[in-house]
Amino acid sequence: MELPDSPPPLDAPSPPHFLDAPQDRWNVFYPAVQTLVNALGGYEEVESPPDSGIFETVYRPGDSVLGVLKDLKKLWRKDDEDDERTVARCMYRAELMKELVAIVVECAERGEWGRKVALVACDLIAALTWPIDVAQELKEIEDEGPVVTDYASLLRAQLEYKALFLKTTKPLKSILSLMVPCLAKPRKDEKDSRIISLGLHVVRNLLAIKDAVAEGTATGEKEEFAHLQSDLITQLDSLTYLQLFLTLASCADKTDLNPFNVIVLDILHLIFRGIKPSELVQDQKRVPIDSLARLLEKEKKQKALNSRVGSTRHSRFGTTITVKTAEQRVVLHRQTAIIENPGKILDMTKRKKAVVAKRMDDLTVFVNLSSDAMVILQSFSKSFLEICYNTFIESILRDIRMERTKIRPSDNIRVFYLSSFFIEYLLLLRHKLLEKGGSRRLEELPLGLVAQIAEMDSVKWLFARLRICWDDKPKAWTELQACIECFTQILLLIDDMSTSTNEEDVEVAEILQHQLYYNYDILDSALAVVREYKNQSIAYLDSIIHFAYVLLRMLEKYSKTKAFMFIRKRKNTHKKRKERQAASQANADREQRKIPEEYGDEGEEAFAPDEDAPSYAEHAFTFQSFEKRFAQEAVVNTLLTYLERFLEFDGPEPMKRVVGLMHRQVIKAHAEGLYFKVSTLIIFRRILDKQHVLPAAPSSRDLITLITYILRKFFKHVEKEPFTLVEALSSKSRGKWKTVGGGSDDDDDEMAGQRGRIKEKMGPVELQFIKKHKFSWSQQMSIAFAIIWGDGHGYLIKWIVEVLEQVLAAKQEIVLTTDGGINGDEDEEDEDGNARVRRFGRPSDEAISKFTQFDLQPEESEQITAVTSNPHFRLMLKLLSFDLPPPPMELDFEEDVSSEELALAREKSDSAWFLPANVLPSDIEASIGALKQYMEEPPTLDDDPKKLLRRKARATRRRRRSPSVESYDSETGEVRPGHQHKKNPRQKRAKKAVETQNYKSAAFIEDSDDEDPEATRRFFENEERLRREMDELAAQGGHPMMERGVKRKRGKKNGKGAISDTPPPSQRGNDRET
């Protein structure tokens, strides 16, 4: 047999660079493969039936067909270390697949020997059609040098194998006949499992081979290769393969069929790969009409775009217009120059900057199936949902958690994809039923059909995979996208459950939402994935936008139904680790004595807690503060990247999502300054120029309205601050966008910087009301509110109202838990059986003792600046019962500190505002009511604030006088009494009080040491009598004593007593204006 000197390029690539032999691998293997293929058998003409004169072509296997097939399998293993896959190319050239298909069809029903031959042939078919992961192959050979491998020819060969396999239904029918006897056995041994697995893998391989991409006018082979997947699905349905898949999936929890759940998962993923649930739910009879309507709409949109360009210079009527400037003369050869802006036309002639094309990924390779195939999949999908989805997914998740060897990393992606597909498909079916027959027909498809993936254990595993993919270096983008899409559909499922008419669904949705939102990591992930988008695929961009839109919408809806929310937030372990390292380093430097190693206890290290393990703390949560976190430049860049593709949006939904997220930033977070950039304004101009091609939907109108609002704000700000035009060229850091165009605070103060240092040394300005006005608390609050509101700092008041609402909700929860209500219906009794006095609107002492101090923690830079250096806002905080800790002194530190460290500590204490624990809920509620009333009807100031307020004198810090040389005894190190400074009367009184207290304490200790039982009994009887008298007095006269044990003083009439800046809570409540 003569071989060609140079094989065709498709089958004979250039030999690998690492082979130095005179004959390459092709010349070595091809003769052997061709010889073995010829020995397999051949076709002959057979008269059937005999003496009929009718002949048909029948394949006759050779006498040694079984041995030849085994030799071919040995040759196939030669490709294990060959990147070029030379043996596979030789087998394609020798047309081995044609022989193997004929052997399977001919020998499958020829008894035991025929089954054995057919199984070996099926093994080779599975090897030849095994999916080729081109990306993974290229990644593996990347480090081996300049290896050039022609994978396109291998993929083309597999496509021809698939076409050969689907010419008739006999090959698939023969493979099914090999599996059925093994499936029918009640107890399957290892051989039966291998036969079933082999048949399923052959079907999986055929489904994995992608169709060729052909134009609408393609004919012949191109048109045939573009519809192979539809033909395969049709044959699988006619040969009951789909029913077999349903059986295996529904029995995946059985011991004998559980080994096949992973391969069934792979098959189902390949069946539904590239199919949109929205297309599957449509009436397939109307699909051609809808497709034609979409094409006409696309053509109309393109014509509308072209009409704006107008005629060119090659049109029938030429037009030439000259544009003259001060030093230039420009000639325009366009008819549109008559009516269009010349500057705009000149911009069109500029060289366009090349835009990097966004790539698509594996999850978005859509297929175009025939109507018959889609009808089959509609029935199969509905049956899969009703029969086996929960059972099948549960078995897969159980195997994943148990880390069985059959589970591969790619199986996670398949679970996510199928789950998101079937959840979306179920929701679309329910929506369709709701439109047709109302809510009664929804019982036909309950939401519990996909309940398994919505279980909390499944959601936790899903989020764990999302975090792992996010933390990987490099990130696993495909699996991350599948996680996000599945998470989005689970959220939509929970949202549908919350609005269901079934009370059980509503209750489950409430529990799931509480557990989801309690974990702050889930909420933070929505912000992270949107913020960290760079240059990933288009489908990934669409997924993260959809995820953020759904999560924010549902979280806002849920938060409106709750008076307060709490979240479990991870602590900053990185900061703790730094502090721990610094402390250990300092201790090491000071350490004078070290313990020898032989005396060390190794067991202590083993049982020591893991200091690097993440720790969590519970925090109050408000949706407004979380929503403001989306007002970042990185998030804006992601939204604008998505918005740039507005002409490619498939329907109004993508536009609705991006406009909704932009609305949250601009309107609700008041972050329109983030869009004051030149690149953003260019995008807005493109949209406004092409708004006539936008779909006629409410989302398009909302987009135009939002853009107009941003532009109006921008130009209004430019008119006020021209420097905004310069700021529009730079990025907007956090906190900077609210002060775009504002002047710097570091201007020259004409004192060589001394004024700034003096202000820093003096600390923040403290204000107080002038005493002669004698304002009530409500009047003081209205004045402070009017000043802050007039300065445009209304967002600070909204923020402090949110903080007070959090504190109020926390304290009310303690009161309800402890007292069972603020006003009890029955008198309670204490431990001694005595009836307690009713507290009309006041919590019990036990509830008050459980109150904790609330530390004010500003998050944004504006809030930090306000609590630190805004005197009017600090005055309002004092009126709201907030307080500051006393400034630290040198004696407060155990070790000597430098002046810089002391100044830093004092600076921190000036902004460490806290709400004391003894502030009652009623006072907080009254403060909130007053602020909300002022927000609805802002008060106005008739007088100048300078006439109402004045600067509060800061208390001078007294220093301890150092002892003089004469008063110091060098021998004893003490100060001589005779040389001590003379004490004033106030110091004498303080010293006497201390001595008296010490004497009483000593007397008390001596009395307690007395062990006379009679004296002890008289003491307790006397105490019991006094307690009864106090209870009777309290019941008759209310509460004559204040909380601190001081009798309330009457106001003086001599004008010397002024209204305090922060009156007691009990006094404030009577002065409030509601």
From Swiss-Prot:
Residues 948-962, 978-991, 1046-1055 have a biased composition (Basic residues). PANTHER family: PROTEIN TIMELESS HOMOLOG (PTHR22940:SF4), TIMEOUT/TIMELESS-2 (PTHR22940). It is found in: Nucleus. Keywords: Cell cycle, DNA damage, DNA repair, DNA replication inhibitor, Meiosis, Nucleus. Residues 1014-1031 have a biased composition (Basic and acidic residues). Residues 572-595, 936-1074 are annotated as: Disordered. One of its GO terms (molecular function) is DNA binding. The lineage of its organism: Eukaryota, Fungi, Dikarya, Basidiomycota, Agaricomycotina. Involved in chromosome segregation during meiosis and DNA damage repair. It holds the Pfam family TIMELESS. Belongs to the timeless family. Its main location: nucleus. InterPro entries: Timeless, Timeless_N. One of its GO terms (cellular component) is replication fork protection complex. GO terms for biological process: DNA repair; DNA replication checkpoint signaling; meiotic cell cycle; replication fork arrest. This is Topoisomerase 1-associated factor 1. It comes from Cryptococcus neoformans var. neoformans serotype D (strain JEC21 / ATCC MYA-565) (Filobasidiella neoformans).
